[in-house]
């Protein structure tokens, strides 16, 4: 384990029907491979120790005896393995046969979790062989030992308290009220599902949505291991679709019709953080009180130190995809829909504020940069919704020491092409006079030099807003606010900040979307040039007429800064 991550796996072994010896050997081989890769939790399919499709052979004493021998081999091999296994198998208890997941750790059976919901419809007839699992935990005997058996079992790691495991089997997750709901409310952070779900047309997509949706609803990790090749095809075909999901996101999915072992690193810290943030995620019915907890220990030093070279992993590599632009959809169609949605949300927010205050005027400091451009576009949309003339949008451009011809021209052209009013107020003399009043050296280009300009601009915007009875529209975006990249009592102040929840990486796409869809070539050309302009507050004098102060040279590219806010917002 490393930085709150834990490596988990869903494995589909090659099996033979009614051959526990062969099947246990295949399970052990996958266990060895997983251990070499640093896997700490490994889930196998339903009844994989015998095969799901044994039919009436399940009722034969010979098969049940050999199944226990297979389990013994697994237990023996697991003694030196620092991991927890969920192995599907039949289990006799008080004269009845149950479909269960045996939970194994270091040569010990931690518990036996029976399947509660036995399908007996369509192609399934499990009630012919098995008894529905009990919720209340009982003790079952194994080799002279008393083992807890029941649905309401939690398996908690002493050395990593964030890791609390629970199990359900196949059909259990397909019912209206799956056991995993109670598991999660009782404290389980990772759900293991030993499954044997057959293939029918379109079922793979439903299965994918079901598992990802359940992990989202329960704010948990979900490891789904499905039966595959090796099962009898007399009545059913199994595709071995394995899925590892976390809080609604599929971390990895196996190809169907090919037995495989998939691995991923779950972020338990994210799960705990998200549950803490969701104040509605709580055990209203005190379900935890009916659960029993079994404790185990794992080595928490490093999940990656044993990665095999065959896997092509570096020792410090995390087995999960880290989206470099988490706020921006990669699919073009989805990205367009997202941009339209965000622009509508921004405009609706401003529309309500304007209508509530009966405000008919807006004041925007238009610099020719990305943020003020987006603020103008949002304001235009809100004014159009309210049927307020666009000339009531007062764009104020305030050139000073750092303003370049490029941004100045773009600001002026943009205001004219959108139909907004434009006023130019050169603040050079006002700022120079202010610096003279406070005895600041004009050649000293320090924070006073920069912030003096920003505060002068805000003062002008506020005064004009008073004069026209309008509202100053804030331009700062979420990335700048998260970094504190703003001037106190300067550009961080406004009456309504329409960009406050929009990261800089997304600002670019919103402006580009508007440029692509506005239907006005001259306006589109200006917007595209704004996109091509380096991000800058333009508070330092230009060099050879070009921007000398580039924000991303000072605070690093904004792409880096979107990761932290995304993690903070979404756990």
Named regions from a protein language model:
Residues 1-363, 381-390:
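Enzyme catalytic cores with a strong preference for nitrogen-chemistry domains
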Residues 161-163, 219-220, 229-232, 246, ...:
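ATP/NTP-dependent adenylation/nucleotidyl-transfer catalytic domains that generate, transfer
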